[in-house]
Every structure is written in C-alpha cells, then in structure tokens.
Amino acid sequence: MTIDSLSQFVLACSLFTSFTASAVPGFWQQGYGQGNTEYSVTDTSGKMFTINCTGNPDQNGFYQHSVFLTLTDNRMVSSHDDGTTVTVVMDHKQYAIPSTLGWRNGDNAWYDFIMDIRKTGQFDVYVNDRKAGTFTVDLKNAEKVLPTPGDCGND
C-alpha cells in the first residue's frame, strides 16, 4: 500500500465513522472532507458500499476515484488495493471497477459505472469474483444524491 493509498484509507475510515452512525439501509448519503466527496449506502446487514470521488488529482493530473466496501466486521476493501478486483453487477451487466484511472479503458469503465449506478435499484458487489454483498437502493434517492460523470470523472 503506498503513502497516497494509506492516507486515503485513513480519510475514508474517518468519514465512514460518521456515515455508519446514521445510515438508513438503502438510502445513499453524501459526505465531504479534504477534497473527497463520498457517496455511501448500507444494506440491512450493515455492509457499506462507498463511491469516493476525489477532487485532488495525482502527480499526472488524473483523479483517482475509487470504491470501498466495508464489511460487517469493519474490514474494508478498496478498488485501489493491490491484488483486489471489485466488480459491480447491476441490471444484468458487470462493471469491473478500475484500480487506477488516467488510461482510456479505465476512464471509460469508470464513466459507464458512474452513469449507470444512478439508475439502478439493486446491485451486487463482487470482490475477487466472490459475491460480497447485495444492495437494494431507493431510486429517487439515488437520482438526487449520486454524482454525474462530470462530478466524478476524468474529463
């Protein structure tokens, strides 16, 4: 884990603490801190899925957005973790979350994910090809709260 990943991890943990205190299952909520906007939703078992939209570009000028999955035992998995693949399945289509952005295929995959997550009422999260959670969300809430590609992209 690099220093940037570690600092993002610490930031995410501190933001997650505030999210979990008042999270209503199935409703997206937004938080902001130190240049990161995070959108989180919990399921009924207490798992939390978070979209991290950073406002801080890396040394090459790219925004390294990511997703996190916090499990019920508070272990956290990030799309930036080495050796970890995170895939979101919604509406019978899979979205492999890129571990880095700033390259055409990764940016295109992220764009498609951000476009479509706003339009789905249910999605599954897979970590290393194993189902890790199912999230059922309120569609009206998702449309109001979740970012558009312009708010969470690399364009």
Language model features by range: what are they?
Residues 18-20:
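N-terminal signal peptide c-region/cleavage motif recognized by signal peptidases
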Residues 1-10:
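Bacterial N-terminal signal peptides that target proteins for export
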Residues 22-155:
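A generic "folded-domain core" signal
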